């Protein structure tokens, strides 16, 4: 059990056999008769239940819902399978009406293009970040990263030149550029990984190699933060623009997360590997608890890291929340939406 973040804002539970309960104004984590951890509700923003075999009392759930503290349940691989949130967060009707209407006009197309270009720019900057100290120490790797970043920049610039009236008119072209960018990005990252690991490239669900397992787990933690930001902005997490709608698929969350995957999770995971931090999977292709603890701590610390945004330095979690609010403002025709581009 651990409290993570700069101000101990996130409680992470990842030990089988533990139970989360409420005592006065604190959440308490017990295993058998032992008290493992306490978290004051006053400072808490989120609870992550990161494995099976962990129980949560109804009193603890009620206290979190009353205070707007989101509880997210993750599989061992980091896939979010349930959220407990306050129903009051879904009460902004005007924003949701405009969000749905925007799909069939240029607002929807603008957002789809913005999410995709933001993703490509941030992938390019992640490669630049990994290359910036290698120009003299490892010139070949520097050139690999530089060329990859240039290629991603070219794709992003080409995306920005597409014109149309609705997202359905251009979705195939957008996804083509995004897919080409993904191939280039992951191929380049493979060459920049400084440790010997069995990694053939990016896999999502069902991955059993350590790199993809770490990425998937990190994305799961980020996903919970993005969904919370989307809901707090009054948006419907299931009505997206870039990702195709399917029953049970949170398309808008998957749209918004694209700008943040590379600067948050990719930077953490490849940083850990290249620093020699021990990460491994067990015989069943699962991340053991100690690796999940390391990843959760690193991702949440990264979200507390500060980046330049709107002419000031802000925590990444604050930037994420502001982007969601800018998105809500945009669909209501009250302001622009620009992608967050992380520095390097």
What are these regions (language model features)?
Residues 47-49, 69-75:
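Short hydrophobic alpha-helical runs that function as membrane-insertion/retention elements
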Residues 77-83:
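Short gly/pro/ser/thr-enriched loop/turn and capping motifs at secondary-structure boundaries
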Residues 83-84, 249:
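Short Asp/Glu-rich motifs
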Residues 1-23, 32, 39, 66, ...:
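Active-site helix-to-loop segments that bind/position phosphate- or nucleotide-bearing substrates
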Residues 59-63:
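A short acidic, amphipathic alpha-helical/loop segment
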Residues 86-90:
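Short low-complexity, flexible loop/linker segments enriched in glycine and/or proline
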Residues 41-55:
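Extracellular/luminal Protease-associated
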Residues 26-28:
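NTP/phosphate- and nucleic-acid-binding module
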